[in-house]
Swiss-Prot record:
Co-factor: note: Binds 2 manganese ions per subunit.
Top enzyme class: isomerase
Cofactor names: Mn(2+)
Gene giving rise to this polypeptide: gpmI
Alphabetized SUPFAM superfamilies for the sequence: 2,3-Bisphosphoglycerate-independent phosphoglycerate mutase, substrate-binding domain (SSF64158), Alkaline phosphatase-like (SSF53649)
Protein name: 2,3-bisphosphoglycerate-independent phosphoglycerate mutase
Residues engaged in binding Mn(2+) 1: D396, H400, H456
Top-rank taxon: Bacteria
Annotated catalysed reactions: (2R)-2-phosphoglycerate = (2R)-3-phosphoglycerate
C-alpha cells in the first residue's frame, strides 16, 4: 500500500476542549467541519502542559513549547524548568555567562539594566528569575535598574499591580525600577517598529509617560484605561536613561518576542527606526539564544540544546519535500521552533508566510490572514509535497484579546479553512492530522474573577485523523506523539531519538 500524499499536520493554535459551553468560543461557534470530523473520524485528545511537554507540573503550555515538542517527537526539557532548577540548586549565581557579565560591568563601573516579564505566567519569562538575577547583581555591588515588562496576557489582565508590588517589596539596596512598559510595546514580533521604538526610547533615553514610582505607574495606566498588556512606556522616578559602560541582561527565555526590542537596543547597523544615540554597552547578555544574528552581539546564559533528527530533518534526510505555512504571528513556530531552534530550512523545505493584519488588536479583525493561509494551503496540497505543516493563528491570537464574540468569529473562519483543507486532501489522496498546540479560546472568562480570560489553558486539545488507514483508531497521548504518527502515515521509520509513540492503533 502506497503512502498517502501529502500528509498534512493542521495545527489549530489555541483550540482546546472544555465540556462547559459557557464562554467557550469553540463550543459556541458554528463549526460544521470540525463537528463532522469529530463525529466521523478517529479522534482522541492530547496533553499540552506540564511534564508531558517538558514544563513544571501545572504550567500551561504555549506555542513555542508546543511546536518544539511536536517537531522533536520527544519531550523536550524547556528553559523554564531548567532555569528554575538552576536557581533552586544554587548554580545560577555561578553561571559562566553571568559571571562574565558581572566582571565586564564592574570593570566599567556601570549599571546593570535588567529587562524581564514581571509575572509568574512562565511563558516568556518569570518574576522569580528576575528577582534572583537582581539579588545576584546587587550582591556584587552593581547598581541595578529594572525595566519591568507588564504581562496581562499570560496572567490576569489587571494583575500587574500585585506583581510589581511583589517585586518592589523584595528589591535589595542598590536596585530600582527604571521603567514600566506593557508587553504590547516591548514584546512585539510582527515588525510593528513604532511600538518597539516607544519601548526602547523609554529604556535608553527615559522618554515617555512619567510616574513617581512603579506602583503609581501601573495605577496611572489603569486610570487611563490601559490594562497591563498595554501600559504605555513609563519612566519611573528620576531614571535618566542608559549610559556608556552599562550592561544589559534580558531575562526572557522565549525568543520570538524578545528579538525586536533587543535588536533596537544593541544590534549593530540596526535601521528599522531611529534609536537615537545608543550606549556603548559593556556587556549584553540574554538568558537564552534568541537567533544567530543576536548571537553576534550578545552572550547567552543557557544555550539551547541541540535537538537531532527533528521531524523536518528526518523527512529531508529521506529525500522528501515538505511545506510550512502560517501567518506572521505563528511563522516562527512552524519553522524555527518546529525545526528544533534552527532558522534555515531543511533541504526540500519550502515556506510561505502570510502577513498578519496591521491592527492594534486582533479582535478588530478576527479572520486575520486565515483566508490567505487557506488559499496557499489548498495550492500546496495539490503541488506534490510529501509533508505539509500549517498553523492557523486565529483561535490563540484572538483568544488573547478576551473578546468572546471575536473569538467565535475567529474559530468560524478557521473552520471554513479546515473545510477547504479536508476537501483538497481528500481530492489529492492524502491524509491529515488535525490538532492544537495548547488551549486558549475555549475559556474566555476567568472562572475566579469573572473577568476576561486571556491566557492559555491546561485543557486537553483534539487530535483527529482524516483519511487515515482503514480501521485505524487513535489513542490519547501528548504532543511528542505527533511526529511519530505523521511518520507512520508517511511509511517512514522512526529515528531512535524520537521517543514519542504513534497515536494510531491499527
Amino acid at each position: 500500500m502506497t503512502a498517502p500524499k501529502p500528509v498534512v499536520l493542521c495545527i489549530l493554535d489555541g483550540w482546546g476542549l472544555r465540556a462547559e459551553r459557557e464562554a467557550n468560543a469553540v463550543a459556541l461557534a458554528e463549526t460544521p467541519t470540525f463537528d463532522r470530523l469529530m463525529a466521523t473520524c478517529p479522534n482522541a485528545t492530547l496533553v499540552t502542559h506540564g511534564p508531558d511537554v517538558g514544563l513544571p507540573r501545572g504550567q500551561m503550555g504555549n506555542s513555542e513549547v508546543g511546536h518544539t515538542n511536536i517537531g522533536a517527537g520527544r519531550v523536550v526539557a524547556m528553559d523554564l524548568g531548567a532555569i528554575d532548577l538552576a536557581i533552586e540548586e544554587g548554580s545560577f549565581p555561578q553561571n559562566p555567562a553571568l559571571r562574565d557579565f558581572i566582571g565586564k560591568v564592574k570593570a566599567k563601573s556601570g549599571t546593570a539594566h535588567l529587562m524581564g516579564v514581571v509575572s509568574d505566567g512562565g511563558v516568556h519569562g518569570h518574576i522569580q528569575h528576575l528577582i534572583s538575577a537582581v539579588e545576584v547583581l546587587a550582591g556584587e555591588g552593581i547598581p541595578v535598574v529594572i525595566h519591568a515588562i507588564t504581562d496581562g496576557r499570560d496572567v490576569a489582565p489587571t494583575s500587574a499591580g500585585e506583581f510589581v508590588g511583589q517585586l518592589v517589596r523584595v528589591l535589595p539596596e542598590g536596585a530600582r525600577i527604571g521603567t514600566v512598559i506593557g508587553r504590547y510595546w516591548a514584546m512585539d514580533r510582527d515588525k510593528r517598529w513604532d511600538r518597539v521604538k516607544r519601548a526602547s526610547d523609554a529604556m535608553l533615553h527615559a522618554t515617555g509617560e512619567h510616574a513617581p514610582d512603579a506602583e503609581a505607574a501601573v495605577a496611572a495606566a489603569l486610570a487611563r484605561g490601559e490594562t497591563d498588556e498595554f501600559i504605555a512606556p513609563t519612566v519611573v522616578g528620576d531614571y535618566a536613561g542608559a549610559r556608556d559602560g552599562d550592561g544589559f541582561f534580558c531575562l526572557n527565555f522565549r525568543a520570538d518576542r524578545a528579538r525586536e526590542i533587543l535588536a533596537g537596543l544593541a544590534q549593530p547597523g540596526f535601521d528599522a527606526y531611529d534609536t537615537g544615540a545608543r550606549p556603548d554597552w559593556s556587556a549584553f547578555l540574554g538568558m537564552v539564544d534568541y537567533s544567530k544574528e543576536h548571537d553576534r552581539f550578545m552572550t547567552t546564559a543557557y544555550p539551547k540544546p541541540v535537538i537531532r533528527n527533528t521531524l523536518g530533518e528526518w523527512v529531508a534526510s529521506h529525500g522528501l519535500r515538505q511545506f510550512r505555512i502560517a501567518e506572521t504571528e505563528k511563522y516562527p513556530h512552524v519553522t524555527f521552533f518546529l525545526n528544533g531552534g534552527r532558522e534555515a530550512p531543511e533541504t526540500g523545505e519550502d515556506r510561505y508566510m502570510a502577513n498578519s493584519p496591521k491592527v492594534a488588536t486582533y479582535d478588530l479583525q478576527p479572520e486575520m490572514s486565515a483566508p490567505d493561509v487557506s488559499d496557499h494551503l489548498v495550492e500546496a496540497i495539490g503541488a506534490g509535497y510529501d509533508l505539509i505543516v500549517v498553523n492557523y493563528a486565529n483561535p490563540d491570537m484572538v483568544g488573547h484579546t478576551g473578546d468572546l464574540k471575536a473569538a467565535m468569529a475567529a474559530v468560524e473562519e478557521v473552520d471554513r479553512g479546515l473545510g477547504r483543507a479536508v476537501e483538497a486532501v481528500t481530492k489529492a489522496g492524502g491524509a491529515m492530522i488535525v490538532t492544537a498546540d495548547h488551549g486558549n479560546c475555549e475559556t474566555m472568562v476567568d472562572p475566579e474573577t469573572g473577568g476576561p480570560h486571556t491566557a492559555h489553558t491546561t485543557n486537553p486539545v483534539p487530535v483527529i485523523l482524516v483519511n487515515g488507514p482503514a480501521g485505524a483508531r487513535l489513542h490519547a497521548g501528548r504532543l511528542a506523539d505527533l511526529a511519530p504518527t505523521l511518520l507512520q502515515l508517511m511509511q517512514l521509520p522512526q529515528p531512535e531519538e524520537m521517543t514519542g509513540r504513534s497515536l494510531i492503533d491499527a
